[in-house]
Amino acid sequence: IYNQVPHWSKHFPMPAKLHYRETENPEFIYFPACVTRIFGGSSLGKDDLITVVLRIADKAGIKISVPRSVHGQCCSQIWEHKGDPKGQQITANATVEEFYKLSQNGRIPIFCDTTSCTHTLLTLARHKGLLTPDNLTKLNLLKILDITQWLHDHVMPKVTVKHKKKHVLLHPTCAARLMNVDTVMTEIAHMCADNVTVPPDSYCCGAAGDRGFMFPEVARSATRD
């Protein structure tokens, strides 16, 4: 039981307020990942990620929609991590079906705000037998973007950064490296800061899904430098 119950920390933010935005003829569908919905803004009083993304989209004049039903979807990664193939199969198929419907048969691009979840969605087809033949076809018609790509390609060309940070320290995640969007993250950071540092030895943070909650010593060891 000990290894199945996450360690609690007073630094964990409370759940985010669920935001909905039904937009007529949206340019993008915004999918807030489970981790975004579970953890809200920091204890320092900063806004949660969903609020920030909606505000950025408004500043860029980009019409995005956050339908109510997206809050019930999951990329299925957690089920894979827990060794539950049936749960993974049910969740993955349900999400693909809902995304296909929300995107109007794949016409409207969908972006996800958590890179590891984006990577999971984009690689569902690699799991033989995970998706039904019908949903595999639907998946191939979906246009799924990571938030880094959405920011770089669609937001940054439409906004002007007036107050740059002096220095930003960047930690590209494992999924960002797998998707080759770590360079995209760095380019965005350079647009927002005078100096950007990416530590040469910044590799896995030790989180590994929720494993860092179960074994915090792994995360401490991975980030000790």
Where does each model-flagged region fall?
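Iron-sulfur cluster-binding electron-transfer modules in prokaryotic oxidoreductases
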Residues: I1-D225
